[in-house]
Amino acid sequence: MTPAPAPMYVPKFLMRQKLTMMVNQYEIYLANPDGSEGELMAFAQQKRMAFKEEVTFFSDRDKTRPVFSFKARKKIDLNAGYDVFDEGRQPIGSFRKDFGKSLLRSSWHLSAPGLEAFGQERNQSIALMRRLWDLIPVLGEVAVPFVFHFDFTDTIGGALVMSSERKKGIRDRYTIVVPDERVDFRLAASMAVALDALQSR
């Protein structure tokens, strides 16, 4: 029996991040057929110190209407993972970082109804260079110059379910492709933000 598609499925979207001393901002756009930014789908802004606990996404930059969110299960144990909620605070899915496997290559687990997926940095060499960069005291405070990507695959069968590709530029810009209809847009968007904001870069 084929699993039902997610309530809100978007096969491709774009994410733009803006970083300041006080807040992180993320703008998520529908991708046009030519790859350009289309409709604004969600906006998130959070104080940097609070970002690891809970993030709320809004329908516009004025933050007039919250539409989904993700929240840490335990504030003192981020290894416990994060739950993603819809506008009515109903769970959509979850994700968690695999800290053991992330020592050399950032690794995550993604869960949705009828789906368990595992994601890693695509390039092992880039992953190692990022870690060496972070070990140098001065350079560790400078934005990482390496372009890195993540791929998530179904733990049963190994099919690609989601990918996040970072683009070169002053700001962080990402293209997120979701081939698997079981992955809700709100879960994919939350995971995409987490890949940027919740790991040491």
Task: Name every feature range the model reports, one short phrase each.
Residues 1-201:
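Intrinsically disordered, low-complexity proline/glycine-rich segments
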